[in-house]
């Protein structure tokens, strides 16, 4: 019997996938680094105070232990987990430094299966969870793969309304008089590209999300490369699409077109082929609160960014997503972050609003064969909720320390709209979202959270129920 058990264990190990790669993505300032830090912290503290009642393997005491193990890919930087914890437990506590490139951390989860057949032959199994972080700015380059240079130029210049028009004034000034068919002036093109980059930085600084090309604001090792020295043609119709499309590659317009092609083919497609093809599960983090606070332009910009992003995901079998990635990702979770920054009675509205934002992707998920869910969470809970009395009436409120100066606050931020806000919402805006510092926390206790265990159950719960199938 012992020999039979040993042979069956070997057979099970050979015939199953013991690895799961999780992609953590999100739009700018959505809390990606905090999410990974908190997720790892909860799992590592599974026997020392972690609160994970919604993770079935933890609730049923089948998750026996978790430890960090070396990465398989030595070329990817290590996720800065320890540095992030040091910031969170510091005096004063601070949020972890946001990610600026690809990073990874790998965990080994030892668990006992609840599979009634295999558990008689295999007492325990190990799941290797690889968590990959990369900037949301890079994710938003994906729609560029479905556009040529001129269609992209039309889209980018079409966005130059309102504040975007103000921030792009210098770029438009430098573009004036640029002859598309003249021999390429690399120095001038570099100056105009720098002005476009400054415009993108202004958009990011003011809380906008639809920023292309994403590498311009987070260039990494590509800083200064000619591949990052292009920009949209300022007025396609004034010159004529046919004339621009046929411009010699050594002309101003031709060089911009060729650099755009290179960026899409070598930078964007290369990045996704290298990393995205290998992902099994994905979580997309979305901060709906800051755009609500910033006004209709910021909110509509976030909506546009999500729409563009999700159009890249729910293409059919013969289209871009299938050709590039194949149906590898089988679970996709959308999470409305910072649930601790609104009162408990508004959590359901947060989720409803996010569902409205991604409804097209939701409708197509079943056809694509991708399991999707949507929830609200706080990776690291920064506030305490309770009731305060106002004019003899008790209302829900939050208590925390303001991020900017650390001053204690007790506030009711207001109501989160359950549906996409219309003009009436913006005219009578009563929503006042505050950014909070992390709470002062004991080093020997896991980080506090809201529904992080629900996210874990969706993303890895099924893998912890079976013996590495």
Report residues per predicted region.
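Post-Walker A alpha-helix
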Residues: 35-36
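Short secondary-structure boundary/capping segments
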Residues: 39-45, 144-149, 299, 348-354, ...
């Amino acid at each position: 019997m012992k020999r039979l058990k040993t042979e069956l264990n070997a057979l099970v190990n050979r015939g199953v996938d013991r690895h799961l790669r999780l992609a953590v993505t999100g739009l700018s300032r959505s809390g990606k680094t905090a999410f990974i830090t908190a997720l790892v912290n909860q799992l590592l503290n599974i026997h020392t105070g972690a609160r994970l009642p919604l993770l079935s393997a933890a609730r049923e005491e089948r998750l026996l232990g978790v430890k960090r193990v070396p990465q398989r890919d030595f070329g990817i930087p290590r996720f800065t987990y320890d540095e992030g914890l040091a910031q969170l437990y510091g005096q004063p506590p601070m949020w972890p430094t946001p990610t600026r490139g690809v990073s990874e951390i790998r965990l080994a989860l030892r668990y006992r299966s609840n599979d009634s057949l295999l558990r008689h032959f295999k007492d325990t199994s190990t799941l290797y969870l690889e968590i990959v972080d990369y900037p949301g700015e890079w994710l938003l380059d994906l729609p560029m793969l479905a556009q040529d240079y001129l269609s992209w130029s039309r889209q980018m210049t079409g966005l130059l309304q309102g504040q975007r028009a103000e921030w792009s004034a210098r770029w438009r000034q430098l573009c004036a008089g640029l002859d598309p068919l003249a021999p390429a002036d690399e120095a001038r093109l570099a100056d105009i590209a720098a002005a476009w980059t400054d415009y993108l930085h202004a958009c990011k600084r003011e809380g906008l999300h639809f920023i292309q090309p994403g590498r311009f604001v987070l260039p990494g090792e590509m800083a200064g490369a000619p591949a990052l020295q292009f920009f949209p043609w300022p007025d396609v119709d004034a010159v004529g699409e046919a004339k621009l499309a046929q411009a010699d590659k050594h002309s101003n317009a031709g060089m911009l077109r060729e650099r755009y092609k290179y960026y899409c083919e070598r930078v964007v497609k290369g990045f996704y082929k290298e990393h995205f093809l290998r992902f099994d599960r994905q979580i997309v983090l979305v901060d709906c609160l800051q755009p609500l606070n910033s006004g209709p332009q910021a909110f509509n910009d976030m909506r546009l960014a999500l729409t563009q992003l999700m159009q890249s995901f729910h293409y059919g079998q013969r289209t871009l997503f299938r050709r590039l990635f194949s149906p590898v990702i089988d679970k996709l979770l959308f999470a409305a972050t910072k649930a601790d920054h609104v009162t408990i009675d508004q959590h359901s509205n947060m989720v409803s609003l996010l569902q409205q934002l991604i409804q097209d992707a939701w409708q197509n998920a079943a056809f694509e064969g991708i399991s999707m869910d949507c929830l609200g969470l706080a990776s690291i809970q920064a506030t305490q909720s309770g009731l305060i009395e106002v004019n003899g009436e008790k209302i829900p409120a939050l208590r925390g320390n303001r991020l900017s100066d650390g001053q204690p606050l007790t506030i009711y931020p207001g109501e989160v709209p359950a549906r996409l806000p219309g003009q009436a919402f913006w005219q009578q805006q009563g929503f006042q979202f505050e950014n909070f510092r992390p709470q002062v926390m004991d080093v020997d206790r896991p980080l506090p959270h809201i529904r992080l265990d629900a996210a874990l159950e969706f993303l890895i719960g099924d893998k912890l129920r079976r013996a590495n199938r």
